[in-house]
Regions:
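Bacterial Sec-dependent N-terminal signal peptides
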Residues: 1-36
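Glycan-recognition and catalytic cores of secretory/periplasmic carbohydrate-active enzymes
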Residues: 35-468
Length: 468
């Protein structure tokens, strides 16, 4: 029984709050039950696609007017944001393939022209290898595969070469930061996600150039994390790339670990390398055994010690929501369904999903929402793999709540608090690259994205599957 919902309080104010919470939960539960079999017409799908297109155009117009050539738009102050000393065009690169997918040809043309005329990686700055890889390297590779302009590939190769020194550690696992001009590295305390979530991008670079150095470096790194797994087949949160020893044994599927698991499975799909499939299957079995808490609201994922399996935390949040889609995509639709029930509960329990909440106490532990895509991502996979209409209804609720609560006059703003709905001055590039893309794909015809031909990266950039 969840604390603070069903318990009777003497305090009248608390009683009213509990009544409102219970009423809200019952309301959304009734809606969800009714929507399982409710029709969702082709016209309704098209209307939702049009809403997403309009949202993308609105956000792009704000970027064009107030942040053209910058990394991001600050939507409240209407100012440009730079990640480093010089813009790396985060938003245009993340947005290009989304615009192409949505059929927004004018916007795609504008993003392409900006990238090809202004992008230059000769920057006197050290950068975070993980973020630059998943946003920029992936975006440029997809742009090349979609558009065919060789300058996209030239830029990708240049960036890949500037990032390669990160792998020059005693173990081969990359440092977190590398200087784009000097190759100097720093921060040897890394994590599985930032180590492993380079495989698709660097592997693809090898396939496109014929130079295996990128693939080999990335594979050595991700497989070393796998080799360092515990006897329970789990990995921890932090590892020293100089010694190969774990410095944090906290295990879960959230930040710092999440996309490591994702890339093991997707790298197998992309390249056909069975080593990745073996590693994923080993981990996935352990995750289901040690990390799932089954509740009446769905299956949540908790935190444990990687060595003992002892539960050390019961928080769940926006980032963890990806695992429902990954489970279903990997063939376990039932586990995916149960986790997605928890995901949707988390979204509707509050106005929008919080960054993190304690699913036992049913209270928020981190109240912000930064336009994250993972819940929509899992909703997309669940609908595509099951055809169940309830996922269209879930998608509709989530997309419309983002539009209702996050939209302003020049774009979309993150929320400081999902309960008060106070906005904050951020619209990151992944809103274009992932959130809008998944929002559209939920309702778009299946032919829009063919699972047999492409695999989506963690930043939702579609990579063409390599011929086996």
């Amino acid at each position: 029984m969840l604390n603070g919902i069903f318990s009777v309080e003497k305090n009248t104010g608390m009683l009213k709050n509990n009544f409102l919470i219970t009423t809200t939960i019952l309301f959304f539960s009734l809606i969800a039950h009714a929507q399982k079999d409710a029709k969702f017409s082709e016209q309704m799908k098209q209307e939702m696609c049009n809403k997403v297109k309009a949202a993308a155009q609105h956000a792009w117009q704000g970027y064009k007017q107030y942040a053209w050539g910058a990394d991001d738009l600050k939507p409240l102050t209407k100012e440009p944001k730079l990640w480093y000393k010089k813009s790396m065009l985060m938003t245009p690169i993340d947005a290009f393939d989304t615009f192409t997918l949505l059929g927004l040809t004018d916007e795609a043309k504008e993003a392409k022209e900006l990238i090809l005329t202004k992008l230059d990686f000769n920057i006197d700055n050290d950068v975070q290898v993980f973020e630059i890889t998943i946003r920029l390297l992936a975006g440029l590779i997809t742009a090349y595969e979609l558009d065919g302009n060789k300058k996209f590939l030239t830029l990708a190769v240049d960036l890949g070469n500037r990032l390669m020194p990160a792998f020059n550690s005693p173990t081969g696992m990359p440092y977190r930061y590398v200087h784009l001009q000097t190759g100097k590295t720093r921060d040897g305390i890394n994590n599985p996600a930032e180590i492993g979530t380079l495989m698709m991008e660097f592997g693809k670079l090898s396939k496109l150039t014929g130079n295996n150095k990128y693939y080999n470096a990335a594979k050595k790194a991700i497989m070393l994390v796998y080799k360092k797994r515990s006897q329970l087949d789990l990995v921890g949160e932090q590892i020293d790339v100089k010694t190969g020893k774990w410095v944090n044994s906290r295990s879960h599927i959230g930040a710092y670990i999440d996309s490591y698991y994702e890339y093991l499975y997707k790298s197998w799909l992309l390249f056909g390398d069975k080593d990745f499939k073996t590693a994923f299957d080993t981990h996935n079995k352990a995750i289901k055994k040690h990390l799932i808490t089954k509740t009446g609201k769905g299956w949540f994922m908790h935190q444990v010690d990687m060595n003992t399996g002892k539960i050390i935390g019961t928080t769940y949040g926006a980032l963890e929501a990806f695992y429902a889609g990954l489970c279903a995509f990997a063939g376990d639709v039932e586990t995916g369904r149960q986790i997605q029930e928890a995901n949707y509960y988390m979204w509707t329990r509050f106005n929008i999903e919080p960054e993190e909440f304690n699913f036992i106490a049913d209270t928020i532990t981190s109240a912000y929402y930064i336009l994250r895509p993972e819940n929509l991502e899992s909703c997309f996979y669940m609908y595509r793999l099951t055809g169940q209409l309830k996922y269209l209804w879930q998608g509709k609720v989530m997309v419309e709540s983002i539009i209702d609560h996050c939209k302003n006059d020049v774009g979309f703003a993150s929320l400081k608090n999902v309960q008060t709905l106070e906005k904050t001055n951020s619209m990151e590039s992944f809103f274009f690259g992932e959130t809008l893309k998944y929002a559209y794909l939920i309702f778009a015809p299946e032919a829009t994205l063919d699972f047999k031909k492409v695999v989506l990266t963690t930043e939702a950039h579609p990579f063409k599957i390599e011929k086996k």
